[in-house]
From Swiss-Prot:
Residues 1-16 have a biased composition (Basic and acidic residues). This is Tubby-like protein 8. It comes from the Eukaryota. Mostly expressed in roots, flowers and siliques. Transmembrane segments: none annotated. Residues 17-28 have a biased composition (Polar residues).
Length: 397
C-alpha cells in the first residue's frame, strides 16, 4: 500500500508540472496572436492551403500512402505517377540552361577556318587532271588504223552525232573523239558520213571533212557497206591500186552480222556477230611499230581457221524497267552514265567469254561511249558501232 501511495503522489506532482507548462505556453501563444500582423496571418493560411493540396494529390495512389511530389513526370505513364529526379534529367536540365544562356552567341566554325583544312582536300579534286591513259601517247593515225597494242589495255572514245557540214547536207555525220579523262583535251580521230544508195547504207570514214569529199585524199580511211535488210555490214580498207591498169582493190577488214530480232516471253533483244582476221599480238614497247590491221581472206566463209569470231553478250531482263539491259559496271567511274537502249552491245571472244573486247553504250540522244581493246583498231571499232546505230529492216526493235 505504501508503494501505491508513492506512485500516486508522483503522478499528482507531474500533473501539476504539466499544468504549469501548458499554462505558460498558452499565455505565450496569446501574446503571439496579439502581436501577429494581418499579412502574416494571410500568408500562413495560404501555406496551409498549399500543404493540404499537395497532401491530397499525394494520396491519389491505390495504396493510400503519400508519395513524394516532384516536377519531373514519367514519360511512360503519362504523368500519373511522379518519379524522383535522376542524374540524366539533372544533366539535361543543366545543358538546357547553358543553351538558353548562350542563345544567339554560338556559331558554327566556318569552312575557311584553320581547323577545317582537311575539308579543303575536296575543293581541288575535280579541277585536277586525270592521269594519262596508256594509249594517249599513240598518234591519231596509229590509234585509228592500226591494231591496238596488247599491253595498252582498253581505249575509251566517244561517238557524237553532229550537224552536216557544207557539201554533205543529205546525210548524217558522226565524229569519233578520244575520251582522255577529266582535265585533258580530247582528240578528234575520225569523222563518218552516212548516206543511202538504193536503200542500202554506206558509211565513208576519214580523218577530216576533206577526206569525205575526196576518197583520194590522204586523210581518207575507208568505207562500210550494208545489204538491203541491214543484216550484214562489210568494213573495207581505203584500197590500193594493183597492176599496170591501176585497178583499185579494197581489202576486207571485218564483217558484222545481225540476226533477226530474238523474241522471248519477256521481250525482244538484238544479237550480233563479228568476224576479224587472226593476227599476232604486238606490244607497245616493241621496237617495231604497231602492226597494220590484217585483212580477211577471200574465202573467209570457208576458211574459219584464219578468222576470229566475236559474239554479243545476252542482256539480262530487268523486272523493274521491264526491258533487257547490259551490265556496264566494269567500266568503272568515268563520269558518263549509260542509258538503256537496244543499240547497246558487248562483244566477247568465243575463247574468253568473260572479257569484253568491244562495248558501246548510249549516253544521250546524240552521244555514245565505246571501249575497245586488242585485236580491234579504232577504225574497226568505230564502224562496228556505226553499224549498231544504223536503222535496219532485220531488227524490229
Amino acid at each position: 500500500m505504501a508503494g501505491s501511495r508513492k506512485v500516486n503522489d508522483l503522478l499528482e506532482e507531474n500533473k501539476g508540472n504539466v499544468d504549469t507548462i501548458t499554462g505558460s505556453l498558452s499565455t505565450q501563444k496569446g501574446e503571439d496572436k496579439e502581436n501577429v500582423s494581418p499579412e502574416k496571418v494571410s500568408t500562413s493560411v495560404e501555406t496551409r492551403k498549399l500543404d493540404r493540396a499537395l497532401k491530397s494529390q499525394s494520396m491519389k495512389g491505390n495504396s493510400g500512402f503519400p508519395t513524394e511530389v516532384t516536377n519531373f513526370k514519367s514519360f511512360s505513364t503519362g504523368g500519373r505517377t511522379a518519379l524522383k529526379q535522376s542524374s540524366l534529367q539533372a544533366c539535361m536540365q543543366k545543358n538546357s540552361e547553358v543553351d538558353k544562356s548562350s542563345f544567339g552567341m554560338k556559331t558554327w566554325t566556318s569552312v575557311d577556318s584553320e581547323h577545317s583544312s582537311s575539308l579543303k582536300v575536296w575543293e581541288f579534286s575535280d579541277s585536277e587532271a586525270a592521269p594519262a591513259s596508256s594509249w594517249s601517247t599513240l598518234p591519231n593515225r596509229a590509234l585509228l588504223c592500226k591494231t591496238l597494242p596488247l599491253d595498252v589495255g582498253r581505249c575509251t572514245c566517244l561517238i557524237v552525232k553532229e550537224q552536216s557540214p557544207e557539201g554533205l547536207s543529205h546525210g548524217s555525220v558522226y565524229s569519233l573523239y578520244t575520251h582522255e579523262g577529266r582535265g585533258r583535251k580530247d582528240r578528234k580521230l575520225a569523222v563518218a558520213y552516212h548516206s543511202r544508195r538504193n536503200g542500202k547504207s554506206i558509211f565513208r570514214v576519214a580523218q577530216n571533212v576533206k577526206g569525205l569529199l575526196c576518197s583520194s585524199d590522204e586523210s581518207y580511211v575507208g568505207s562500210m557497206t550494208a545489204n538491203l535488210l541491214g543484216s550484214k555490214y562489210y568494213i573495207w580498207d581505203k584500197g590500193v591500186r594493183v597492176g599496170s591498169v591501176g585497178k583499185m582493190v579494197k581489202p576486207l577488214l571485218s564483217v558484222v552480222i545481225f540476226t533477226p530480232t530474238i523474241t522471248t516471253w519477256t521481250g525482244s533483244y538484238r544479237r550480233m556477230r563479228t568476224l576479224l582476221p587472226k593476227q599476232q599480238p604486238m606490244q607497245k614497247n616493241n621496237n617495231k611499230q604497231v602492226q597494220q590491221a590484217s585483212k580477211l581472206p577471200l574465202d573467209w566463209l570457208e576458211n574459219k581457221e584464219k578468222i576470229q569470231k566475236l559474239c554479243s553478250r545476252i542482256p539480262h531482263y530487268n523486272k523493274i524497267s521491264k526491258q533487257h539491259e547490259l551490265d556496264f559496271r566494269d567500266r568503272g567511274r568515268t563520269g558518263l552514265r549509260i542509258q538503256s537502249s537496244v543499240k547497246n552491245f558487248q562483244l566477247t571472244l568465243t575463247e574468253t567469254p568473260r572479257q569484253t573486247i568491244l562495248q558501246m553504250g548510249r549516253v544521250d540522244k546524240a552521244r555514245y561511249v565505246i571501249d575497245f581493246r586488242y585485236p580491234f583498231s579504232g577504225y574497226q571499232a568505230f564502224c562496228i558501232c556505226l553499224a549498231s546505230i544504223d536503222s535496219k529492216l532485220c531488227c524490229t526493235v
